[in-house]
Amino acid sequence: MAKKSMIAKNKRPAKHSTQAYTRCEKCGRPHSVSRKFKLCRVCFRELAYKGQIPGVVKASW
């Protein structure tokens, strides 16, 4: 879980475009965040297994 101060800081607009970085919308994790879903790999996996992300299915080949 991210610190509340870091989550609040990330919500403010960056002064320069290179300062902006992605954080997970659910838990605030800064690493391994998917841009398409705005979720980290851990939260993405949890929600995908529960079936809460439309169009995402477990791969089988």
From Swiss-Prot:
Note on cofactor: Binds 1 zinc ion per subunit.
Residues annotated as binding Zn(2+) are C24, C27, C40, C43
What is the protein name given in its UniProt record?
Answer: Small ribosomal subunit protein uS14
**UniProt KW keywords:** Metal-binding, Ribonucleoprotein, Ribosomal protein, RNA-binding, rRNA-binding, Zinc
Q: PROSITE patterns, per this entry?
A: RIBOSOMAL_S14 (PS00527)
Alphabetical list of NCBIfam families matching this protein: PRK08061.1
Annotated family: Belongs to the universal ribosomal protein uS14 family. Zinc-binding uS14 subfamily.
GO MF assignments? rRNA binding; structural constituent of ribosome; zinc ion binding
Q: Give any single GO term for biological process.
A: translation
The organism encoding this protein is: Streptococcus pyogenes serotype M49 (strain NZ131)
HAMAP family documented for this protein = Ribosomal_uS14_2_B (MF_01364_B)
Return the GO cellular component terms, semicolon-separated.
small ribosomal subunit
Subunit annotation: Part of the 30S ribosomal subunit. Contacts proteins S3 and S10.
Q: What does this protein do?
A: Binds 16S rRNA, required for the assembly of 30S particles and may also be responsible for determining the conformation of the 16S rRNA at the A site.
Name any cofactors this protein relies on: Zn(2+)
